[in-house]
Amino acid sequence: AAVPASASGVLLVDRAAIAENYRILKAAFLEKAVAAVVKADGYGLGAEQIVPSLVRAGARSFFVAQLDEALKLRPLLDRCHPAIALYVLNGLTPGTETLFADNTILPVLNSLGEIEAWSRFAQQRGTAQPAAIHLDSGMCRLGLPPDAVERLRGNPGALDGIVPTCILSHLACAEEPDNPKNAEQLAYLKQALTALPRAPVSFCNSSGIFLGRDYHFDLGRPGVALYGVNPTPAAPNPMRPVVRLLARILQIRAIDAPQTV
């Protein structure tokens, strides 16, 4: 590809490589279900261009960070396939319940307050509402902390009207296979799951997929590895490169070695 005369550079995005990376990750996940994280406009590479390739490669669940991202992608996903689950990682903000429900978008419930609001909305509508529930197993970013999980254990009615489609958590140090934090999070997650209704579990991010079968559960959730970033920094990159930058050379000069540049 040539650099247009009006541009100083061009970034090429290889959608076939993204699809191949999805297949590589699915194989590493032992051919179980693998979602695709396409937040921040597909990590800046263009979600609307990337999503159809991922659907053709087999992705049936997608994660974004913000509701506005999901609202933009929902029509495209519906055109690509009739049964695509679309999750919003940043959860349910006040007043957005109807937008989620009417557009078939699934909130990831990160707090007891969000669970209460979604349950109340379901009861007002008179129909059960699907959602994911996020447990903080040690990342300390989003999700229900241990005390909130124990409150749910003691009050299962808090989930009235909610159909958990997925229970997720996030590994903090998966790119370091020998980090004891990984095993600590796994042990806590197994214990915390006993407080909740049975549902598919999503624990593995890109690097987590390569930690092995014990960490896999039901649904992989890779992000950066889809776009060519090495999920195993201590080993060769198993992913195909996705982006290539072409830049125009502005000037070539010969100078003497003592001169500064």
Per-region residue spans from a language model:
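Alpha-helical scaffold segments that flank or form the walls of functional sites
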Residues: 21-23
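N-terminal nucleotide-binding beta1-loop-alpha1 segment
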Residues: 26
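Active-site-proximal beta-alpha core segment in soluble small-molecule metabolic enzymes
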Residues: 5, 9-13, 17-19, 29-191, ...
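Short, basic/glycine-rich phosphate-binding loops at helix/coil junctions
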Residues: 1-2
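Anionic-ligand-binding alpha/beta catalytic cores of soluble enzymes and soluble regulatory domains
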Residues: 178-261
